[in-house]
């Protein structure tokens, strides 16, 4: 898994608070247990005009032509509230999002996003409002995230964010739980060679 050190991308300004996991990926799409294929169902109720997903809703921001290919999601407070389904970050990642910016995130959703190699950035409500205004006024322009410096550059303004050092290390180095374990493969092998066979 590639590390996420810096990222520049288009921003989708989803001007809504309390976007819950059922809005992100409705329950009827949760049967699969692999992480791929959920992106087409992302924001199903808002994004499509029909249950079969054949008609896009032209009034939903994700469908606006100027935001196609966006990799950064900007929302209001409490993103990812509701049920703890890990399919929500799966759907966002499968669609192509790498970074989310909001004043706050639901705790489980926040951790699930980090576990799925997405960066949830918390900024103040005032800072998020400034970014909304900039995105609306600067159609087609990208913003830049630097995880090493822990900054978000929007036009000529720099915002600073915080992230737990362990989580930052994992994102920078592309490490998931398996990758972290494999960093200790030699020690694990040495331990296993010393224990009785019936305990292996």
UniProtKB/Swiss-Prot annotation:
GO CC terms in record: 3-isopropylmalate dehydratase complex
Pathway given for this chain reads: Amino-acid biosynthesis; L-leucine biosynthesis; L-leucine from 3-methyl-2-oxobutanoate: step 2/4
Family matches, as Pfam families: Aconitase_C (PF00694)
Any one GO BP annotation for this protein: L-leucine biosynthetic process
Output the Gene Ontology terms for molecular function: 3-isopropylmalate dehydratase activity
Q: Which Gene3D superfamilies match?
A: Aconitase, domain 4
Tell me which UniProt keywords the record has, alphabetically.
Amino-acid biosynthesis, Branched-chain amino acid biosynthesis, Leucine biosynthesis, Lyase
Q: Which NCBIfam families match?
A: leuD, PRK01641.1
What's this protein's function? Catalyzes the isomerization between 2-isopropylmalate and 3-isopropylmalate, via the formation of 2-isopropylmaleate.
The name of this protein is 3-isopropylmalate dehydratase small subunit
Gene from which the chain derives: leuD
């Amino acid at each position: 898994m590639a590390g996420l050190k810096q990222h520049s991308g288009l921003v989708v300004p989803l001007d809504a608070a309390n976007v819950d996991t059922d809005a992100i990926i409705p329950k009827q799409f949760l049967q699969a247990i692999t992480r791929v294929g959920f992106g087409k169902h992302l924001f199903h109720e808002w994004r499509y005009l029909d249950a079969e997903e054949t008609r896009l809703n032209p009034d939903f921001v994700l469908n606006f032509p100027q935001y196609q290919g966006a990799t950064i999601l900007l929302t209001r407070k409490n993103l990812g509230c509701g049920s703890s389904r890990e399919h929500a970050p799966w759907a966002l990642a499968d669609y192509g999002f790498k970074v989310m910016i909001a004043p706050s995130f639901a705790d489980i959703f926040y951790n699930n996003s980090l576990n799925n190699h997405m960066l949830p950035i918390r900024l103040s409500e005032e800072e998020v409002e400034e970014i909304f205004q900039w995105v609306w006024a600067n159609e087609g322009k990208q913003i830049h995230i630097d995880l090493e410096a822990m900054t978000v550059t929007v036009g000529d303004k720099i915002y600073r964010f915080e992230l737990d050092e362990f989580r930052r290390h994992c994102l920078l180095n592309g490490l998931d739980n398996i990758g972290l374990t494999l960093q200790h493969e030699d020690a694990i092998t040495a331990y296993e060679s010393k224990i009785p066979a019936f305990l292996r």
